[in-house]
């Protein structure tokens, strides 16, 4: 077999494709010859970290992925979970970190576009989006530009496409100065018996290209996303894709219409590594070969090479295996929606991935070795050292508790995110019941009288850095807790694991321990991982990001009329804390923002207590007994109470005199498995008796009423003063009002 090879394959070319010398040797051994330039590009795309998960696969296999409601776990475009009545929720989260740092608007926009395609490729109509964003320190010269671009990109794409953004996170830390994180989540609803998968079945079937035309944008994007950054970062701008949400909306409608005709055998969106990855995955999963004819690919640029067509990451494109007799019907649907429809290949029985271009064979490779048999590493890893305990009596108490609380609610990381989410359409589709700013976003299930879904995304990177195992557990527990705080039953989760360079044993150790913690928490809480994404090499000039294993979860509310909000308390309600008194100040935001310290261990997560306390809180909400509920997380009890008071516009009078421990630990400690409930006075005693009977720790805190948050003689702050501090930081920062705002 002779394949013309016009570009010499040099060690420099191999290295620039992200392939190590031993990986290139493996290619030579596999195919018995030197690869063509196109084949080198194909191997580079399929064997990079972004597509093959070669450093993480071993550990991802340890995660719990099955459960009574799980219809489809990891391995497809998105996870699928049963929500009763013949419906299912389809969801996934994935990163677009590297592109968003280089070109923030398009990087973030195409991150949203890619995750929406993952959902509707499965046959689901998207109903909700979230995004978890991490930026560098506020006074870094690039941060404001990146925040502005990313938020505009997320909003520009999601709003135009027509999906409500119902939640997310925005955090700042110097460790993200050279490597921001954009983790995009989407969920959709489908019929449980009409899920579409990517596994091709049958020989001699047409492989069809759908959607927008192919250009040169994003060539090599997946390879870039598997590398560390250095000073040459600006040169990587051409590897960022450009998105068009209106084309994507047409693609959604055309795909869902086509799926109803019975024409679709397999379907895969073109994401990372474009045509290469989608074709290889469809063939390899179905134990079939694929023959592609690139001359039939719709292009929007002239003289595109086979290499460029195979690796382009142009957006809004799909690949499908079709029932041959339905070809004309399918084509008519796509033409109606103004989209390209082209038969670009066939399935074969030879397990080869063959690519033809201008009459020449430019690639002929073993498809299984590109796909599910790509290299896999068991990288050396080192356990993180344990931090010494930090008793509360060794941590300075604030001179003025009220000032300390104002400082926290008005800080870069605890202040209101209204500036961000008001740029997103949170209400489109008309089903949003809870908007950003609470514990979880809640969306009605269209067509059902009482059913709704709750969504949350969580991780506390400073905890993961201090103790990756406990930090991994805590990310899962907080997500589960936020969903529970609405009254929803947490069903399943998706993970987006963002770490530095896995070739460094200490970074690989963070990853391994965090995955172990995530797995333990998911098992204890019956919260399986059904989809996800790993983003490694998040380093610039050798400085790694904080380890950030984001967990996004979905919960089911059978009757949304009984759900809890954080701001729905009534005057005269009693305030009760479920869980233990605050005692843990290690890694707390009080320590970080008030005392400028990062000492101590992360809080331990008692998963038995999480389960017991959460199940109790959920039952109280579902019985219609709670008027409001909020989980206690960063900032401890004081910040949770302040957020509830600001959300409801009603004051709280709190008495901590029976609390055991130091006052600053009671108020700012970040112990886990805790909630604040407000209950009508005549119900509160009954709930407390039930808690006692169930072995659930609780503390009566006080009463709702007035216009101030009053905690004994320690804090007395008018709600308006809290709101002024809470709401002003973000707009002041973005408008550059007094650079002091950025340096807080």
UniProtKB/Swiss-Prot annotation:
Q: What PANTHER family does this protein map onto?
A: PHOSPHORIBOSYLFORMYLGLYCINAMIDINE SYNTHASE SUBUNIT PURL
In which domain of life is the source organism classified? Bacteria
Q: What is the lineage of its organism?
A: Bacteria, Pseudomonadati, Pseudomonadota, Alphaproteobacteria, Hyphomicrobiales
Keyword Ubl conjugation in annotation: no
Pathway-wise, it operates in: Purine metabolism; IMP biosynthesis via de novo pathway; 5-amino-1-(5-phospho-D-ribosyl)imidazole from N(2)-formyl-N(1)-(5-phospho-D-ribosyl)glycinamide: step 1/2
Family assignment from sequence similarity: Belongs to the FGAMS family.
Source species of the chain: Rhizobium johnstonii (strain DSM 114642 / LMG 32736 / 3841) (Rhizobium leguminosarum bv. viciae)
Family annotation (NCBIfam families): FGAM_synth_II, PRK01213.1
Where, by residue number, does Mg(2+) 2 bind? Answer: 118, 269
> What UniProt keywords apply to this chain's record, in alphabetical order?
ATP-binding, Cytoplasm, Ligase, Magnesium, Metal-binding, Nucleotide-binding, Purine biosynthesis
Protein name, as recorded = Phosphoribosylformylglycinamidine synthase subunit PurL
Q: What does this protein do?
A: Part of the phosphoribosylformylglycinamidine synthase complex involved in the purines biosynthetic pathway. Catalyzes the ATP-dependent conversion of formylglycinamide ribonucleotide (FGAR) and glutamine to yield formylglycinamidine ribonucleotide (FGAM) and glutamate. The FGAM synthase complex is composed of three subunits. PurQ produces an ammonia molecule by converting glutamine to glutamate. PurL transfers the ammonia molecule to FGAR to form FGAM in an ATP-dependent manner.
Top-level EC class: ligase
Quaternary context: Monomer. Part of the FGAM synthase complex composed of 1 PurL, 1 PurQ and 2 PurS subunits.
Catalytic function, reaction form: N(2)-formyl-N(1)-(5-phospho-beta-D-ribosyl)glycinamide + L-glutamine + ATP + H2O = 2-formamido-N(1)-(5-O-phospho-beta-D-ribosyl)acetamidine + L-glutamate + ADP + phosphate + H(+)
**Residues bound to substrate:** 95-98, 117, 241, 313-315, 535
Q: Which residues bind ATP?
A: 53, 92, 495, 532
Binding annotation for Mg(2+) 1:
94, 533
Listed InterPro entries:
PRibForGlyAmidine_synth_PurL, PurL_linker, PurM-like_C_dom, PurM-like_C_sf, PurM-like_N, PurM-like_N_sf
The record's gene field reads purL
- E.C. no: 6.3.5.3
Signal peptide (residue range): none
One GO term in the molecular function aspect is: magnesium ion binding
- Could you name the active-site residues? 50, 96
